[in-house]
Amino acid sequence: MNRIIPPENLPELLERAHMMAGVSLAQIAAQRGLSVPKDLKRDKGWVGQLIEMELGATAGSKPEQDFLHLGVELKTIPIDSQGRPLETTYVCVAPLSNIQGLTWQNSLVSHKLQRVLWVPVEGERHIPVGERRIGTPILWEPDPQELQLLQQDWEEIMELIALGKVEKLTARHGEVLQLRPKAANSKALTQSIAEDGSLKMTNPRGFYLKTSFTAMILNKVFG
């Protein structure tokens, strides 16, 4: 399987993304010599990884933007027949300890969401995985209002983490950004701050964008 060379510049990345629009996942997988999973229950990240590979993303699982040299994060987003997002969008792992001095401006969430290339993909379960088509890509930068909402949610969530209240945070917290358990395996544990300021063990958490927020982004472009 040939590794795709990363795009040299933003126009090249956008050209590659636009060339995928209307193409099925099976067609792209065949070009790369990959087999298509029957369903995504055990291969939840397969679609995203396939798109990353086809576009030449560089980050892998590293905590940086997928196209660091272009300042662009790549996000595939499963949509229904009306163009609405079907699930929340994972942003990054949330820090639960050693957070002194961490601000919104130097946070990984802020870094990852500076500029995002959204790639919509048909996601309704009745469509076989290989037959799902890729949609028109959207290059998005948060406007001042969106940035304010993101920062506000992030700061409120991080304040509760700092106070040792991570267990009290539910997916309902936050207007556009939420905190949820990250690990597929509930036995996975990481250190977090306890209410008395000591460290305790808890399940890893991740930051996710709510569907109401990503629907707003898609609506701005597709109406």
Swiss-Prot record:
GO MF terms held by the record: DNA binding; endonuclease activity
Subcellular location: Cytoplasm
Keyword Cytoplasm: yes
Keyword DNA damage on entry: yes
Protein keywords: Cytoplasm, DNA damage, DNA repair, Endonuclease, Hydrolase, Nuclease
Ranges annotated as spanning the membrane: none
Highest taxon, organism lineage: Bacteria
Gene3D superfamilies the UniProt entry points to: DNA mismatch repair MutH/Restriction endonuclease, type II
Family annotation (SUPFAM superfamilies): Restriction endonuclease-like
One GO term of the biological process aspect: mismatch repair
Gene Ontology CC annotations of this record: cytoplasm
Stated role: Sequence-specific endonuclease that cleaves unmethylated GATC sequences. It is involved in DNA mismatch repair.
Family the UniProt entry places it in: Belongs to the MutH family.
Name of the protein described by the UniProt record: DNA mismatch repair protein MutH
Organism in which the protein naturally occurs: Shewanella baltica (strain OS155 / ATCC BAA-1091)
Source species taxonomy: Bacteria, Pseudomonadati, Pseudomonadota, Gammaproteobacteria, Alteromonadales
